[in-house]
């Protein structure tokens, strides 16, 4: 179109303009001047500038959406670069063995003999979405891949997908290639018979062998406020997890679950809550010093490293309440503060545990975990008898007992013993227990009653001679053996045989 000496190219709505370069060449960019109102069939158009978007293109068509008034068109092109070969791999392990920057077609197979790929976790959307995928051989981050079915945790994947394998800042990624990557040959399906994915338990020394995977590291101690563990693992809540995520504190021992996402040289774990597995579980180990939190921590999970027995009484104390529903099968007793003839009386009809208080317990369980509790900044308590002479003392951490007979422990035969020396830590009481502080010269026993003032038969008896009478005042012998059920007077005290 020539108007007053100005020449312009006009093409109208729904018409097309195709620009091509000679064979063996590729268009790298096109610059227009004037008014351009069109779309393109390949590459990327931004205003008056078009680029090939890193694709090999020797012809591009523009379709007008309205009238176009073009003054000039500058087409930049170069020799076609050799097409890079596309590697073929059959597992994530094989993918991660490639050099960074390699284009590859990843084949994921299903079935018992297949790689059984599963989606672990999805973060973000669109061209920056991170979908962490695990198969039987390893894990990788699918990055910027827009699937035909949205990625969701627990899905299984089978089929083929082409992308570029890169390692960025230590993170292995399988990235989308513009105009190449699609999921048309990839089956993305919800689980049918498969169990929900779970974290892989690893040791910190194997961190770099499990990049992009969902892992669990147990017994990690936080050594500073920067949430760094003794093994150099750093907790970074990059995903912004809020669901059942409780930030730990310096000195805490925790089980940590999350995605292994290195940050250059930093070994980071990005915590996630998934499939009822908490990102942080506090650990209280009877063998290790326990550090109390500065303030109460609500909705926490706590794992105890301790084995209990239903065959004998043992002492127990924890810095959180335990409701009756979480103590199924347990028998619990508290010190009533009553003492009779050096016998400390316990009430064995308790149904729950209060933070900080010392208890006796019978329970058949090992290393129990408690969910949704409040970890309290409550120091261990001491329960002292009414006369002030006998105490039942709770401890969370290992405690060195005195060797002067004033601090005693409960043995598995339910007798109260005192350490005679400190050799080989013979006087070391484990944490999550309680001990007895008593007069050094006293021969102390324990007894149980359903109510504080009830009469009961002691669990421990001395060799002191007995005189046993029935309620009619008749002498019936010097032993309790073979007596029928009933109420008796033994050395001046009422006793019930059931």
Question: Language-model segments: which ranges?
Answer:
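OB-fold nucleic-acid-binding modules
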Residues: 81-280
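C-terminal outer-membrane/trafficking sorting elements
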Residues: 336, 451-498
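Extended extracellular/luminal ectodomain segments enriched in beta-structured repeat modules
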Residues: 21-31
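Short beta-strands within extracellular/lumenal beta-sheet-rich domains
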Residues: 3-23, 47-48, 69-71
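A short, polar beta-strand/turn micro-motif
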Residues: 24, 70-86, 171, 175-201, ...
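Short beta-strand-plus-loop segments that form exposed binding edges in beta-rich domains
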Residues: 60-69
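Short, surface-exposed beta-strand/strand-loop-strand elements in extracellular ectodomains
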Residues: 32-49
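A glycine-anchored, Pro-Gly-centered beta-turn/N-cap motif
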Residues: 28, 355-357, 483-487
